[in-house]
């Protein structure tokens, strides 16, 4: 008797194929119904695919900017989309940076004119340097930053070196040039971190407050709040219109900054300038607008050989330190803010802005503008949404427009610019709280920097005294191992400076 072979469970569970299923449909009605359903499913799938493709094409057409290909390439080089920004935000950020730093083209020429330089020519040089340096930062650094002569370096040149008769202006510009070259070489060879390690942390943190004290002192002196007495400084005439306007400007400026009002510096300068017209402080002579004055008397007016004297080493270091640490802090702050706000992994190379800054220092000295640096007020652009160098280009364009207003800048009184100088200086002094007060061997050198700067009215000499005091205090405390070998190399030059100055 033949037995049937058992069927495999796999074969029994396998579904029927399409051909067997169609053959199983005996009646024509069922066969026709199957093909109708198949056509409906295919039509529905085709409709879905077509709608998805149409939507993607429509999205591409909507997101594509309506600009020419050449203009698209120029704008695309900034990486606006990669950093999470738009062209509108970049424009707003550029205007914000301009309003936050426009006071420089008024304050700095006034400070340099106190040293005997022609105000109109200096104003032209400063505006040109600010516009070109800021544009270079936008094109090559691709960061929203404004470059302008720093108040600390300008104060050192105008009041310590030139006005006190220590050196002439070409020699001072030579010092600025060599400090910029040192900054450039350190950036090219990548040894910025080595220099930062040589200078003690307490001295680095005291450099900013020392510059702030010196800047505030300059503001008090220019406003007549402080005058030279028979043996020391004395209180000026507080009842004079200039002193009253300065004090009023300081109070208003502090209130505006506390409320984070944009363009507070410009508001105070314009308000006091207008109020000063009936008080006789503002003198309007001639048309407020016109062609800028020729800067030919300041162009390439520089002494590169005479500025290399060993006696000027502390001043060279003062220029370098103020430029180096100021630029480093601002660049790192702005780049970190951009990275956190954009929420992108795009790496921002800080080497390029350092190259632009150091090159601008050298170029500025050739144009008669000392110590070009990256301004901390550039953070206003990052706060306004600026992420790329396009913001810097907008700010540079605004500064270039100011060239036709150089006669108006000469009419602004010192009572209008002094509040800005005082508030900026006091704000920088607030950084002294970061110094470690638990270790006297670190605290005392920082205090020496501030006290010597205030007593001698020279933050270059104050920094030199702090560096020399650091070595002496560490040796006396038995902590000579904390001294970097580079400090031992600098010590003989510092000793020579004080012996020569005695």
Label the predicted regions.
Residues 58-121, 234-235, 269-351, 495:
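Helix-loop-helix hairpins and the membrane-proximal interhelical loops
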Residues 165-278, 393-502:
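Membrane-embedded alpha-helical modules
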Residues 3-24, 31, 47:
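Low-acidity, Ser/Thr- and Arg-rich intrinsically disordered low-complexity segments
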Residues 116-135:
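Loop-to-helix transition at the N-terminal end of transmembrane alpha-helices
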Residues 71-108, 129, 149-159, 163-208, ...:
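Helix-loop-helix junctions within the multi-pass membrane cores of secondary transporters/permeases
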Residues 131-151:
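Juxtamembrane transmembrane-helix boundary signature
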């Amino acid at each position: 008797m033949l037995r049937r072979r058992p069927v495999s469970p796999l074969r029994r569970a396998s579904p029927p194929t399409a051909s067997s299923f169609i053959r199983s449909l005996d009646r024509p009605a069922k066969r026709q119904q199957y093909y109708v359903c198949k056509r409906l499913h295919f039509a529905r799938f085709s409709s879905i695919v077509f709608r998805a493709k149409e939507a993607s094409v429509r999205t591409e057409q909507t997101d594509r900017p309506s600009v020419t290909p050449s203009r698209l390439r120029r704008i695309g080089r900034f990486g606006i989309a990669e950093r999470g920004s738009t062209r509108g935000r970049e424009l707003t950020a550029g205007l914000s940076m301009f309003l936050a730093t426009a006071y420089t083209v008024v304050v700095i020429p006034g400070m340099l004119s106190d040293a005997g330089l022609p105000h109109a020519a200096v104003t032209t040089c400063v505006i040109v340097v600010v516009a070109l340096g800021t544009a270079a930062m936008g094109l090559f650094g691709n960061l929203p930053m404004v470059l302008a002569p720093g108040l600390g370096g300008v104060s050192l040149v105008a009041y310590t070196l030139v006005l006190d008769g220590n050196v002439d202006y070409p020699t001072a510009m030579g010092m600025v040039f060599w400090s910029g070259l040192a900054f450039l070489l350190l950036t090219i060879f990548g040894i910025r971190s080595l220099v930062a390690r040589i200078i003690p942390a307490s001295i680095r943190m005291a450099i900013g407050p020392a510059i702030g004290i010196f800047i505030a002192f300059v503001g008090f002196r220019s406003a007549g709040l402080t005058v030279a007495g028979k043996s020391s400084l004395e209180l000026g005439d507080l009842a004079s219109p200039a002193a009253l306007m300065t004090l009023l400007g300081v109070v208003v400026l502090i209130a505006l900054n506390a409320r984070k009002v944009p363009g507070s510096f410009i508001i105070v300068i314009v308000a006091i300038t207008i109020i000063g017209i009936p008080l006789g402080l503002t003198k309007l002579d001639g048309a407020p607008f016109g062609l800028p004055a020729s800067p030919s008397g300041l162009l390439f007016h520089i002494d590169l050989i005479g500025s290399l004297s060993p006696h000027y080493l502390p001043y060279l270091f003062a220029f370098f330190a103020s430029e180096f640490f100021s630029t480093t802090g601002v660049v790192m702050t702005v780049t970190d803010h951009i990275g956190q706000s954009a929420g992108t992994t795009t790496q921002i190379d800080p080497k390029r802005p350092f190259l632009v800054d150091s090159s601008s220092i050298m170029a500025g000295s050739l144009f008669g503008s000392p110590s070009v640096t990256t301004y901390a007020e550039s953070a206003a652009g990052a706060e306004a949404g600026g992420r790329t160098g396009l913001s810097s280009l907008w700010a540079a364009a605004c500064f270039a427009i100011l060239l036709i207003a150089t006669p108006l800048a000469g009419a602004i009184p010192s009572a209008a610019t002094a509040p800005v100088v005082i508030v900026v200086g006091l704000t920088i002094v607030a950084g002294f709280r970061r110094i470690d007060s638990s270790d006297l061997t670190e605290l005392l050198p920082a205090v020496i920097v501030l006290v010597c700067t205030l007593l001698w009215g020279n933050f270059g000499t104050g920094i030199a005294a702090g560096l020399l005091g650091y070595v002496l205090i560490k040796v006396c405390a038995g902590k000579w191992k904390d001294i970097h070998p580079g400090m031992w190399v600098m010590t003989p030059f510092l000793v020579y400076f004080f012996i020569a100055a005695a």
